[in-house]
Amino acid sequence: MQMLPSKLFELITNLRGVFSDLEQMGIRVEIGDDFAKFRSLRSQLSNRGPIYPMFDVASSYIDQGNGFWVCGFNPDGELIHTQAVRLLDLDGVSLDQHLKTHRHKYITPGSTPDPDLTFYSGPEALQTITGKVCYHGEFWLHASGLGGPRSQGATSMLSRILLEIMVGAWNPSFVFALVPQRLAAKGAHLRYGYNHCDHGSWLDANQQMTEEDHLIWMAANDLANLLARKPQRFQCAKNVSIAQFTKPAGMPKANCISVKKQEAIM
């Protein structure tokens, strides 16, 4: 993941309020590109299904050159948030063609009896999304009931962190994610920052639906408009402090930004 030092400083400055708010919610954020570590962290979540193959180093080639992840931990050091993004080179290839070829890496594990004969269809945008494309997945934030991070706006803030870094590092033509229908119906794409949400589904050889996933996406101009707006803030946040940045060897490569929680304000 390549980023000029000046761009990296601008990014951290833009996000310092977001990091401060998350600190006040009791969330320590870690960002990295070691997907063996991500796989290890993800395996701790026994209440979730298997990691998606697109982000699993045992199934896909993914490293600091084409991906990074964001994780969140509570004051006890427990993992309460995950998300990841992967850069795809779809030059001359539509997202529709890509999903047909690599469908096994996007199908929810265990959702269909025959992944070889299951395909995604529906959204017209599948034909127009091409070029430098990012896939945003593995988004999860632990539900903590009323007064928890979700109700305080953490979903939008965590997504904003990933999108800011993604644009700063790669400036993609498009970004997309696949969201279960039950979440799309609740407007999840809006909390993630996306403004396009198209109905889609996975169909088996008999054209029977095995899973209903909405395609949420943004083009470069949508991303620019989103990032031009100030990030959503936690209303109770009062103190703003810049995030601690751990500079790896060989700048301008940025492979770890760590926010250290100073006080847990619940």
Q: Could you say what each language-model-derived stretch is?
A:
Residues M1-N14, M54-G77, G200-Q208:
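Short N-terminal signal/transit or membrane-insertion segments
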Residues M1-Q44:
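N-terminal capping/interface segment
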Residues I27-V133, G137-F139:
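A conserved beta-strand-loop-helix scaffold within acyl/acetyltransferase catalytic domains
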Residues G72-D76, L87-D89, E138-G145, V179-Q181, ...:
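Short, flexible loop/turn elements at secondary-structure junctions
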Residues Q97-D204:
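Acyl-donor binding region in acyl/amide transferases
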Residues V175, V179-K253:
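Long, compositionally biased interface segments
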Residues A249-M266:
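Long, low-complexity, intrinsically disordered segments
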